[in-house]
């Protein structure tokens, strides 16, 4: 009698577990993400996955939105979380890059007030990408949006005389990518201003003070 009750209990537990994770036995941590539109404080976040995009990855990346400064997020009107194939296709179609090799080096991009984020977990086939990498890339892209929405006359924050002067003195001050142009120099400096302010001060106190002076309302 006790054995029968025990077996019934085990069967019941198995049934309940299958109900939770599906009869296929698929772990909820391995569930594939579905195309959907999420909302973050009024900002639509479009999820554009493929058959390899895990919901767990989307959840982790979505959490990075709340770690962004409000004064950066408020300028953004929409965000796209794109699987690598969709992200690369858009980069090629819109002429941002000349070939897939160039596109594979890029983790995020912006068009005016829209941010596009590559949701891959590896780049170049073997380099791991985690939520912290995603967070920092998102911050970089949001500084581009900030730059695009804070024009004063014919001048943008990234082509301010102070930025241009510091950049011209040492284009590689913030690394190879920052040396690309003043737009990337500005976004790289903005990212460092948020996550490594002391490091930015060491590299250029004038650059740090410039970011301190920017409007953050």
Task: Name every feature range the model reports, one short phrase each.
Residues 20-22:
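C-terminal motif of bacterial Sec signal peptides marking the signal peptidase cleavage site
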Residues 158-217:
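Metalloprotease/metallohydrolase-associated module, dominated by Zn2+-dependent proteases
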């Amino acid at each position: 009698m006790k054995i029968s009750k025990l077996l019934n209990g085990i069967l019941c537990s198995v049934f309940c577990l299958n109900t939770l994770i599906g009869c296929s036995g698929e772990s909820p941590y391995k569930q594939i993400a579905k195309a959907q539109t999420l909302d973050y404080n009024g900002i639509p976040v479009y999820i554009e996955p493929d058959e390899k995009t895990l919901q767990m990855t989307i959840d982790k990346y979505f959490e990075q939105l709340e770690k962004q400064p409000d004064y950066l997020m408020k300028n953004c009107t929409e965000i796209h979380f794109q699987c690598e194939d969709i992200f690369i296709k858009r980069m090629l179609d819109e002429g941002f890059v000349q070939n897939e090799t160039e596109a594979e080096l890029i983790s995020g991009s912006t068009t005016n007030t829209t941010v596009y984020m590559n949701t891959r977990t590896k780049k170049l086939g073997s380099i791991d990408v985690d939520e912290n990498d995603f967070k920092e890339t998102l911050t970089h892209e949001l500084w581009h949006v900030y730059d695009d929405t804070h024009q004063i006359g014919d001048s943008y924050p990234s082509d301010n005389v102070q930025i241009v002067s510091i950049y011209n003195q040492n284009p590689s001050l913030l690394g190879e990518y920052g040396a690309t142009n003043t737009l990337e120099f500005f976004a790289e400096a903005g990212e460092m201003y948020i996550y490594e302010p002391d490091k930015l001060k060491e590299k250029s106190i004038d650059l740090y003070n410039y970011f301190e002076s920017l409007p953050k309302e």
